[in-house]
Amino acid sequence: MAALSGGGGSSSGGGGGGGGGGGGGDGGGGAEQGQALFNGDMEPEAGAGAAASSAADPAIPEEVWNIKQMIKLTQEHIEALLDKFGGEHNPPSIYLEAYEEYTSKLDALQQREQQLLESLVFQTPTDASRNNPKSPQKPIVRVFLPNKQRTVVPARCGVTVRDSLKKALMMRGLIPECCAVYRIQDGEKKPIGWDTDISWLTGEELHVEVLENVPLTTHNFVRKTFFTLAFCDFCRKLLFQGFRCQTCGYKFHQRCSTEVPLMCVNYDQLDLLFVSKFFEHHPVPQEEASFPETALPSGSSSAPPSDSTGPQILTSPSPSKSIPIPQPFRPADEDHRNQFGQRDRSSSAPNVHINTIEPVNIDDLIRDQGFRGDGGSTTGLSATPPASLPGSLTNVKALQKSPGPQRERKSSSSSSSEDRSRMKTLGRRDSSDDWEIPDGQITVGQRIGSGSFGTVYKGKWHGDVAVKMLNVTAPTPQQLQAFKNEVGVLRKTRHVNILLFMGYSTKPQLAIVTQWCEGSSLYHHLHIIETKFEMIKLIDIARQTAQGMDYLHAKSIIHRDLKSNNIFLHEDLTVKIGDFGLATVKSRWSGSHQFEQLSGSILWMAPEVIRMQDKNPYSFQSDVYAFGIVLYELMTGQLPYSNINNRDQIIFMVGRGYLSPDLSKVRSNCPKAMKRLMAECLKKKRDERPLFPQILASIELLARSLPKIHRSASEPSLNRAGFQTEDFSLYACASPKTPIQAGGYGGFPVH
């Protein structure tokens, strides 16, 4: 640091000695004054000091640039050290000394850089500048944008180029990630980083250009009347008559046309480009792919011990990073409207979690979310029962219990007393205790599979059933009560696309009994026997899955482990969402307190669930992300991230938001609307994902819009109309082209 400062000071001092004769005429004195000014050790004195300061000022921007390069070089040294020794829990002491030396040097360089920036921005004019006044340089930067557009942004200290140009780019339908920024220096364009401080570029001109590989086109708008459920992509309000881009699917009202992005960006290919560029320039070593300790909850096997030296270095508060990433990680704004309990995750024991605390109004969620789809059908056309329609859950219960207005007209005291007595009787019959199956009534058969929290058997109880024995040998009273509370909600689930809950048992151990499904799982069909489904069948499977999840969410039930292993197909391809687990028995308990830890099927986990930074990461939108992965399996026939064999690397990249499924692998005959829906469900930010009522409406609209092959009207089939073979003898109606025997008609002689 001393050598660096001394060198810089000599350069400035030399300039002072050569340029200011009134300062004493001694080049050495000018050098001393320049060095003092550069190091910030003393204030310049009158006379020679003023001349040296005046001569050194023009060199400050150049010194700032040099310091910036030194900072970059120091950071590279730190990253190289971390690449070499960062994965070791007890690195050598010489490595720690070198690490501390580089970080101290980096802090000093950054502090000196800040001092120079302040002197550059808040510089006061000297006597020479008063004698020769110049127009003050405005702290602005001129920027040339794509499509021959330009703008001017203020050069504020501490603000990056990205933040300064973000608004201007968004108004033109662009994002910084799809553009590159250049500065003009010596007549040449030199690229600069988006995280560069804008104050370093005061008075310069920047050029923003779209990257070559970014699919950027102009919109192709058409007027459209949306007869099904659709929302404006700008104001998020209901859309009936408006416009839609045929390329990117952007929908809007006529009054919102001024807010439409000017450019049409294919974000699917853009995400793929970012991921490929990231892996190309920033490979993640295997020893560094484990998730940082601060992002993993306590108790996770992936987190190193807190008293080791390695994690302290990896999570050091210094500006350097252990792994080079494009920008610092910022967790998405989490939605705290739904307060649900939590539990451990398992790759083979899925879970449906029940919110027994407070019902959730899906209308409010839909209103806040909006949806970027092609629109969809009204939920009235859905085969979903009324309980799955969007709306307040209290209203749904009222609809289920009141068949019509006639019951409301019963106001006599006798009828109301009878109703109350009937309700009490039904309440006693429908209690949770009546759903408990006594010990000895279930005949347990062959073992089907096992997971971290239970084992599934095929059993007999008034027919074939699936019995899931839970790994809880001696439940505490708190666990047993929570288990019964959740069973009280599960017993009310009745839907064609949900495995039927039939009961539970507590002796000899906790177990739940569900309907037995004769078919195989969707995972078995797609990845084991590789069944080749037609596209219309795949879309129907997606529709039924969305319909079942829509019903669960309307019941305030979060699945929390939706994946292709838990979706079963009957022989007639009827979808059954199953493997109901319970959050109570899948959590780590200490007395009456419940704790969480990261485990489960990582391929289907949303980024916010992987991070586990919030007390409550599970929500309706986390199920939507898992459904997006299921859609990816349906449309590609393979699992995501099949090219990455390191589980920790997948956890790190998905949790940080740098890895998403490659949508370019979908089948060629996959509809564009389905691909857009898949991209919406796989949004990295939770609040940007749609909800299942909108997803179901879009899939139903897509299914109705697919071309269907009908029987030709020119080739009728009498069998299809209900005729039997005996009926043909009753009607001697010959075809017009059939030769007619002359014996039937006397007008033709017979020769």
UniProtKB/Swiss-Prot annotation:
Cellular component terms (Gene Ontology): cell body; centriolar satellite; ciliary basal body; cytoplasm; cytosol; glutamatergic synapse; mitochondrion; neuron projection
Protein name per its UniProtKB record: Serine/threonine-protein kinase B-raf
Composition-biased stretches (Gly residues): 1-32
Catalyzed chemical reaction(s): L-seryl-[protein] + ATP = O-phospho-L-seryl-[protein] + ADP + H(+); L-threonyl-[protein] + ATP = O-phospho-L-threonyl-[protein] + ADP + H(+)
Protein kinase domain span: 442-702
Superkingdom assignment: Eukaryota
EC number: 2.7.11.1
GO terms (BP aspect): alpha-beta T cell differentiation; CD4-positive or CD8-positive, alpha-beta T cell lineage commitment; CD4-positive, alpha-beta T cell differentiation; cell differentiation; cellular response to calcium ion; cellular response to xenobiotic stimulus; endothelial cell apoptotic process; epidermal growth factor receptor signaling pathway
Keywords: Acetylation, Allosteric enzyme, ATP-binding, Cell membrane, Chromosomal rearrangement, Cytoplasm, Isopeptide bond, Kinase, Membrane, Metal-binding, Methylation, Nucleotide-binding, Nucleus, Phosphoprotein, Proto-oncogene, Serine/threonine-protein kinase, Transferase, Ubl conjugation, Zinc
Record organism: Mus musculus (Mouse)
Compositionally biased tracts (Low complexity): 46-55, 297-324
Associated clinical condition: Participates in a chromosomal translocation that produces a Tif1a-BRAF (T18) oncogene originally isolated from a furfural-induced hepatoma.
Residue numbers bearing the Omega-N-methylarginine modification: R656
